[in-house]
Amino acid sequence: MRVLELTQENKKNVLDELIKRSPNHYGEYEAIVADIVENIKENGDKALFEYTAKFDKFELNADNIRVTEAEIEEAYASISPEYIEVMKEAFQNIKAYHEMQVRNSWFSTKPDGSILGQRITPIAKVGVYVPGGKAAYPSSTLMNIVPALVAGCERIVMVTPPNSEGKVNAGTLAAAKIAGVKEIYKCGGAQAIASLAYGTESVPKVDKIVGPGNIFVALAKRAVYGYVSIDSIAGPSEILILADETANPRFVAADLLSQCEHDEMASGILITTSKELADKVVKEVDGFVAAAPRKAILEKSLSNYGYILVANSMEDAIEAANDIASEHLEIITKNPFETMTKIKNAGAIFLGEYSSEPLGDYFAGPNHVLPTNGTAKFFSPLSVDDFIKKSSVINFSYDALKAVHEKIELFAEKEGLYAHANSIKVRFENE
C-alpha cells in the first residue's frame, strides 16, 4: 500500500486519482453489447438461445429455459442446514430493515375543500439479474429481491446463467426459494438484460431491472435504460476507513482487505490522523496478504488502489472522505457518532470497531447494493423506494377552482398556451 501525507498542495491530485479510478472507455464492449441487444430485440428466443450456446456452452430451448420447481428443491436440499438457517436469518434481517422504508400514500384537504395528495404504487414487474460462476453470491440474490418483495411488486422474475450442463448455482436457487421467488430463467450476460427489457417468447418483459454483473451486463443495462428502469451501473467495490489513534491496526487492515479481495479494480483506502497507526496497518496488511487464499487479487488491487493517507487533522480527513464519497465508509474513531455527523457522502456508514463492513454485506439488514465510484454524492443504496412509483393527486371542487381560475388563465396566457387557459375558462363561460 502507498502511504502518502495528505497536504493542501497534493490533495487535489491524490483525490482525483482515487475518484477517477474506473475506466470510462468501453468502445469495443459497447459495440458488442449494442449488437446483442438489437439481436435480442429483433429475434427474441432464437438469438437468446444462440448466445447461450456460444457463451455458456449450453443448448437452451423453450422447454428447459425455466428453472423447474424440482431443480429448486434439489438445489435447496444440497445446501447444508447451517447455511440455510443463516440465509433465512439474513433474509429476516434484510426484510425487517426494508419494511421500515415503506412509504404510505397521503392526502391533505385545504381550507377551500381542494384535496392534494400522493399515491404510492409498486412497480408491477421487476427483473433481478444474478451472476453465475465465481460471482454467484446468494447474499446479492437476497439483497436485490427483498426490497421489491417489501414494496409489493406483483411479479419478480430472476435470470441467472447456467453452466455447460444447464445447472444454476445451488446457493442462488436456495436464496431465491427463501425469498419466495419461483420464476427463474436460465440466461445471463447482456442477452439476459435485453430479454428482460424487450421480452422474448420465453422471457417476460419487465418494467425494471436490478442486479450486479460484469461489464457486458452493466453496458446492457445502460443501453436499455429509458425503455425500462434500472438500479445503477455499479463499479468495482471500494472501502474507505476513517481512523484516529484509538483504532486497532489489525482490525483496520482486515477490513481494508475485505473489499480488496473482490477484484483487481477494488480499492481500499485508509485516511488517518495517526502516522503510527498507518505504519502498523501496513505491517498487518502485509501479514494478512501473505497468507490469503486470494493473494494474487489482493496484491493487484492494493498495488492499483491501496492507499493510506495521513491527514493533519480529522477535519481534513473528513473533507477528503466526503470528496471521495466511498461505497463503504467505516469510522473507527474515539467518537464515531460525532464524526458521522460531518459525513455528507457515503453509500453505507459503519460506526465503531465492531461494525465491520461484512456485517452490511450479509447480515445486518441494510442493502449492500451501494453507489460506487463517487456516485454516493447523488445516489443512494438500493431500497424500497427503487421499486415504487409516486403519482400526484389533485381534486378541486367547483368553488375551489372558481376562486383561482383567473390566476391560472393569466399564467397560461402569459406563456402563450391559450388552449391551457381555455381548458379552465370553458368551465365558467356561462357565468
Question: What is the predicted function of each stretch?
Answer:
Residues M1-A124:
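N-terminal Rossmann-like NAD(P)+-binding subdomain of aldehyde/semialdehyde dehydrogenases
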Residues R103-S108, A266-I271, A291-L302, I332, ...:
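Flexible, glycine/charged-enriched surface loops at secondary-structure junctions
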Residues S108-A174:
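Conserved small-residue-rich beta-alpha loop and adjacent elements
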Residues E154-N163, G268-S274, G352:
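Short internal beta-strands
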Residues G180-S258, H262-S267:
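Conserved NAD(P)+-binding/catalytic subdomain of aldehyde/semialdehyde dehydrogenases
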Residues H262, L270-A346:
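A glycine- and small/hydrophobic-rich beta-loop-beta segment
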Residues D323-E431:
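C-terminal core of ALDH-fold dehydrogenases
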